[in-house]
């Protein structure tokens, strides 16, 4: 990848031929038109910051894709396997909407606040044809998704777990607890997706929005479940 900086008319051909042409804000209009990016503050250090923030955005996109595919893989896997185990519709339509709309949206907002790390600048440039979904992400999605499916199926079928819940029509108590388990596993997957080979809690202080969103994801469905349960008991 070749970058070229320039501010004069004679720099225009090189700015056009470079992979990325950086024209100075104080340069000629010809140079600005030929370049891909105009550096308004006329500082070469701005190029370094632009690369850093660009790599941070690229990392955040990959984190969100990892989270989304892991959650969808888990939900689809549980939904497809459960009928063979005698469990019908472990995830309702409303719950699936919560997973796909609320969790995905909040997950995207949480990753948007990820701080730029200087470690990103030590990585080699990305190839033009490099897929946004790399082998590490595929392995992570398969491992975490498979583990989530296994834990969910164990929760739904193991006698030591199912015996802890009151027998109701349609196993409502068990399935409600199962949905809470799925939410907790989704939050864990959020923490795991954001670290990318780092410690699970690395850099959390630099992204307080992430902690707030994860707390809301946990509190809202659990609180709603308890409120609905108390309302149902009051009407009996």
Predicted segments with their positions:
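Conserved acidic donor-binding loop of glycosyltransferase catalytic domains
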Residues: 24-25, 236
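Generic leucine side-chain signal with a strong bias for well-ordered alpha-helical environments
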Residues: 15, 233-236
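PDZ/PDZ-like domain micro-motif
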Residues: 14-15, 31, 211
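Acidic, divalent-metal-coordinating active-site segment for phosphoryl/phosphodiester hydrolysis
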Residues: 8-18
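Conserved small/polar residues in nucleotide/adenosyl-binding loops
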Residues: 225-234
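Hydrophobic alpha-helical membrane segments
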Residues: 189, 209-222
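Membrane-embedded transport module
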Residues: 1-3, 18, 25-197
């Amino acid at each position: 990848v070749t970058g070229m900086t320039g501010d004069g008319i004679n720099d225009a051909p090189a700015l056009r031929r470079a992979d990325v042409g950086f024209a100075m804000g104080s340069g000629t209009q010809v140079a600005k038109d030929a370049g891909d990016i105009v550096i308004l503050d006329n500082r070469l250090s701005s190029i370094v910051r632009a690369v850093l923030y660009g790599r941070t955005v690229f990392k955040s996109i990959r984190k969100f894709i990892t989270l989304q595919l892991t959650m969808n893989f888990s939900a689809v896997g549980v939904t497809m396997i459960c009928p063979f185990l005698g469990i019908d519709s472990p995830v309702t339509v409303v719950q699936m909407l919560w997973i796909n709309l609320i969790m995905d949206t909040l997950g995207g907002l949480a990753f948007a606040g990820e701080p730029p790390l200087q470690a990103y600048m030590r990585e080699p440039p990305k190839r033009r044809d490099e897929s946004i979904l790399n082998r590490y992400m595929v392995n992570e999605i398969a491992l975490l998704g498979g583990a989530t499916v296994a834990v969910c199926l164990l929760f739904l079928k193991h006698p030591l777990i199912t015996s802890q819940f009151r027998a109701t029509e349609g196993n409502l108590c068990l399935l409600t607890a199962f949905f809470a388990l799925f939410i907790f596993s989704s939050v864990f997957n959020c923490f795991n997706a954001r670290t990318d080979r780092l410690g699970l809690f690395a850099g959390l202080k630099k992204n307080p929005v992430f902690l707030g969103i994860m707390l809301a994801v946990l509190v809202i469905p659990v609180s709603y479940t308890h409120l609905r349960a108390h309302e149902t008991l009051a009407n009996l």
